[in-house]
Amino acid sequence: MTTLATFIFLVTLLFVLWQPKGLDIGFTALAGAFIAVITGVVSFSDVFEVTGIVWNATLTFVSVILISLILDKVGLFEWSAIHMLHASKGSGLKMFVYIILLGAVVAAFFANDGAALILTPIVLAMVKNIGFSKRAIFPFIIASGFIADTTSLPLIVSNLVNIISADYFNISFSQYLSRMIIPNLFSLLASLLVLWLYFRKAIPKSFDANHIKKPIDAINDLKLFKISWIVLVILLFGYLISEFTKIPVSIFTGIIAFIFLILARKSNAVNIKQVIKGAPWNIVLFSIGMYIVVFGLRNAGITLILAKILEYISNYGLFSTILGMGFISAFLSSIMNNMPTVLIDAIAIGQSNVHGMLKEGLIYANVIGSDLGPKITPIGSLATLLWLHVLTQKDVKISWGTYFKTGIIITIPVLFFTLLGLYLTLILF
């Protein structure tokens, strides 16, 4: 059973990351799940349990991405980015900092995938239009992709990993926010510092800001642009209301996304079919399929091994527990993707004989490691692979070697300081 479960998991993961001839990740994961069921590695009751765990998370994620795609077509993100350029007043360093801050805000409210895949092309087009060299463009591109993950901690909806973990351990919106807002600030500050230290020689000291277009010129539909702000306020209230009413957050985000699609239907700036097609529907199938395969590892007793390791680490106190869990999940995410990692770790945490504040430390450190760890390697998250593909299409090629060298140097210190922020949160508040 152990060998078979491990084999099914590794083969499924290989095909998900490799995607031969464009094989869809949803189909691959479901195929792996089907094999796991017919071989007896998982039962039908496991299938229902997995569906119960992931349905809210994945539908929330898809809804948020749908909303962000409409906002992108309207021009909200480009409008925001142009404001950042004007605020920089010709300073390359200020522009670098403001773009990172914008990325952090977008990641918090529209998920890491939305920030990386929507904001990066906008930033790329802007720095090219300004006339930056390839050497000068690289820091802005890496920063846009990096900050999307490192600051996707504060809200449950900021990352699919967050939603999965919060649903698994029944963590409320406000409870999650109270624990992750300080770590996210630590991550933002550490990211700013580390990115600046790493790229300080490549960032231009100044640029000509006279030819940057006005923010108003980025808006493709002024009426829908104004409505967008109302939608954002309602979305935020939806997050809060879902907590007090105990109604799944996906119901609120789904209704808001549907209404927004109806409102955008008459806009010339938004192609509804294109927006709906652009949503990550395959993530729903991928989540269910991949997590069924992961449950096979649980049934085979593999997650119990990790549970024992976590129990051992917890004997050395809260700080060691947080650091250990954070770096374990980061390492696993970097080599086998953060989506299966977060659930494997969550299952192990649930199986471990760790309680109280130590268990809380494990839960949140797992989220932090699974959010930040993927930046170490290109295969750490599906978003990174897609991000690299988008850049290649725009004639910006970043080799896996270059990405790994940059990613590991930048990620490790940021991960440490973010985990330190979690430790301080738990002991002080």
Swiss-Prot record:
InterPro entries: Arsenical_pump_ArsB (IPR000802). It comes from the Bacteria. Coiled coil: none annotated. GO terms for cellular component: plasma membrane. NCBIfam families: 2a45, arsB_Sta_pI258, PRK15445.1. GO terms for molecular function: arsenite transmembrane transporter activity. The chain crosses the membrane at residues 3-23, 25-45, 50-70, 99-119, 137-157, 180-200, 222-242, 244-264, 275-295, 316-336, 372-392, 408-428. The keyword Transport applies. Keywords: Arsenical resistance, Cell membrane, Membrane, Transmembrane, Transmembrane helix, Transport. It is found in: Cell membrane. This is Arsenical pump membrane protein. The keyword Transmembrane helix applies. GO terms for biological process: response to arsenic-containing substance. Involved in arsenical resistance. Thought to form the channel of an arsenite pump. Belongs to the ArsB family. It is a multi-pass membrane protein.
